[in-house]
Amino acid sequence: MRLSELSGKEIVDIKRAERLGVLGQTDLEINEQDGQITALLIPTVKWFGLRKQGHDIRVPWHHIQKIGSDMIILDVPEEMPPRQE
């Protein structure tokens, strides 16, 4: 699958039934050694779509359960803390 095919898909946490963002607004963490995607870095958002600075949710790639035609379903552990920048 190409990155362009992933772009625009909604990211949903299956445990919380919560929309986390859209892949176009998300950063990817890539292993420089082998070029594999290791994690999604999802920015936290305040009201009206304004981004809260410095806080991202880091979701390891292996937490992705399913990539569908219009969404990506994640199984995010409850204890996963936000990433500080």
From Swiss-Prot:
Disulfide bond annotation, renumbered to this chain: none
NCBIfam families according to UniProt: spore_YlmC_YmxH (TIGR02888)
Family to which the UniProt record says this protein belongs: Belongs to the YlmC/YmxH family.
Transmembrane feature ranges: none
KW tRNA-binding (keyword) present: no
Keywords assigned: Sporulation
InterPro entries documented for this protein: PRC-brl_dom, PRC_barrel-like_sf, Spore_YlmC/YmxH
Transferase keyword on record: no
Domain of life, source organism: Bacteria
One GO BP annotation of this record: sporulation resulting in formation of a cellular spore
Protein name: Uncharacterized protein YmxH
